[in-house]
Swiss-Prot record:
This is Large ribosomal subunit protein uL6. GO terms for biological process: cytoplasmic translation. The keyword Transport does not apply. InterPro entries: Ribosomal_uL6-like (IPR000702), Ribosomal_uL6-like_a/b-dom_sf (IPR036789), Ribosomal_uL6_a/b-dom (IPR020040), Ribosomal_uL6_bac-type (IPR019906). Gene3D superfamilies: Ribosomal protein L6, alpha-beta domain. Belongs to the universal ribosomal protein uL6 family. It comes from the Bacteria. Keywords: Ribonucleoprotein, Ribosomal protein, RNA-binding, rRNA-binding. GO terms for cellular component: cytosolic large ribosomal subunit. Coiled coil: none annotated. It comes from Fervidobacterium nodosum (strain ATCC 35602 / DSM 5306 / Rt17-B1). Part of the 50S ribosomal subunit. This protein binds to the 23S rRNA, and is important in its secondary structure. It is located near the subunit interface in the base of the L7/L12 stalk, and near the tRNA binding site of the peptidyltransferase center. GO terms for molecular function: rRNA binding; structural constituent of ribosome.
Length: 184
């Protein structure tokens, strides 16, 4: 079994967790998140602690137990991220590097000049918030860690950093190792 799942997830006082046969709901001050319940995993709430254990009663063979135990760590982390999301939220910061490269927000569209002959328009999903505090900085935030990361990756994909010059869209904490150019 996953070592991290041997510890319980501690629920803050302002977070409610409800479990049905088909889904897990976590409700907090920032919103509500849902997760499909997996038959391999058993989730128990005891007071303000959530325990995630393998549901070995469903296992038909000894080989299945390994898969079940692997899912425990995954579900422990998913539920923990849901709890963190509805209390604190998640944030990814992107930086635009390059002469003439910039971004601006118009309504729910992110409009970027990235060196193409046309402007790039990116529709911002309703469950994610995008801010542009400066023309070369984009902040993506929300309560669902997977959605925040995916939207940030989709924005970055429009102009990934050039391995020679470093121009493009990069994460603020990303370290680029630039390649050396040709030598004459």
């Amino acid at each position: 079994m996953s070592r991290i799942a041997k510890k319980p997830i501690v629920l803050p006082t302002n977070v409610q967790l409800s479990i049905t046969d088909s889904e897990i709901k976590v409700k907090g001050p920032k919103g509500e998140l849902k997760l499909n319940n997996h038959p391999f995993v058993s989730i128990k709430v005891e007071g303000n602690e959530v325990w995630v254990t393998p549901n070995l009663e469903v296992a038909k063979r000894k080989a299945d137990e390994r898969k079940f135990k692997a899912m425990v760590g995954t579900y422990w982390r998913l539920i923990r991220n849901m709890v963190l999301g509805v209390t604190e939220g998640f944030k990814k910061e992107l930086e635009i590097v390059g002469v003439g490269y910039r971004a601006q927000l118009q309504g729910n569209k992110l409009i970027m000049n990235l060196g193409y002959a046309h402007q790039v328009e990116f529709d911002v999903p309703a469950d994610v918030k995008v801010e542009v505090p400066a023309p070369n900085k984009i902040i993506v935030s929300g309560i669902d860690k997977q959605r925040v990361g995916q939207v940030a990756a989709d924005i970055r994909k429009w102009r990934e950093p050039n391995p020679y010059s470093g121009k493009g869209i990069k994460y603020v904490d990303e370290v680029l190792k630039l390649k050396e150019g040709k030598k004459a």
